[in-house]
Every structure is written in structure tokens, then in C-alpha cells.
């Protein structure tokens, strides 16, 4: 079985999981040598993508206007941040056929509503708790 490294680069922190272990470090303290060696690397990035420069074979996630039953409220996939997109896809996986209201409280506060049929109704982004 392949060793898969999942990385999330946010505005404030870099988080990763590998073989069931979760790690997080502030972006300003992140160095590539903190990451374990992996056969496959997948990353979500709303922060500084160059933090992974020098890491080979990284597959960066992108937003899509449609994915399986998900249908974005935005006409242009790039208008929906990959972090919000992946959160909605994950929530739909864990709570199928249910209306889902998502709140993400990170550097920014985001709110999104996805109906049971997968139709994204839109969302809101505002400054995070540390800024308010």
C-alpha cells in the first residue's frame, strides 16, 4: 500500500496527515524537512504554494463547478476556494442526502449551505476571529 501524505496550506498554518498522524505548524515556522517521505502527496493550498517548492510529485487540489452530485453556486470554479470546495465534498461524503450548513472558523470565517441534492446555495466569507 502506498504511503499517502495529505497537506493543507492555509493562511496561518500548514497541516498534514500521514499514516493516521496529524501535524500542524505555523506557516512562518514551516520547513519541508518536517514532512515525512511519502509515495504520493496531495495538497490543498489557499496560502503560499511555494512552501512546497522542492517537493516532487505534488498533486494540488482544485475547485470544480461540479463534482459527483455537488453543483457549485458560482459560475466560475476559481471563485470558490479549494478549501471551501473540499470541505463541502467531505461533508457530503460523511452526511449524504442531507442539507448541510458548514461553518469554518480559521483565519477567515466561512459559511456555506449545500442542499441534500448537492446544490450549493452560496456562502459568505468574513474576517476570522483573530481579526474581529
What is the meaning of each model-derived region?
Residues 1-17, 21-101, 117-131:
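Nucleotide/phosphate-binding catalytic cleft detector across ATP-hydrolyzing
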Residues 114:
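C-terminal, flexible cofactor-proximal segment of oxidoreductases
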Amino acid at each position: 500500500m502506498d504511503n499517502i501524505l495529505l497537506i493543507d496550506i492555509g493562511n496561518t498554518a500548514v497541516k498534514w496527515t500521514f499514516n493516521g498522524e496529524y501535524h500542524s505548524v505555523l506557516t512562518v515556522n514551516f520547513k519541508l524537512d518536517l514532512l515525512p517521505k511519502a509515495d504520493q502527496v496531495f495538497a490543498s493550498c489557499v496560502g503560499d504554494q511555494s512552501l512546497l517548492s522542492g517537493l516532487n510529485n505534488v498533486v494540488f487540489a482544485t475547485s470544480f463547478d461540479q463534482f459527483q452530485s455537488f453543483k457549485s453556486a458560482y459560475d466560475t470554479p476559481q471563485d470558490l476556494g479549494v478549501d471551501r470546495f473540499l470541505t463541502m465534498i467531505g461533508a457530503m461524503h460523511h452526511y449524504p442526502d442531507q442539507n448541510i450548513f458548514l461553518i469554518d472558523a480559521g483565519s477567515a470565517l466561512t459559511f456555506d449551505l449545500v442542499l441534500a441534492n448537492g446544490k450549493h446555495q452560496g456562502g459568505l466569507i468574513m474576517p476570522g476571529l483573530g481579526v474581529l
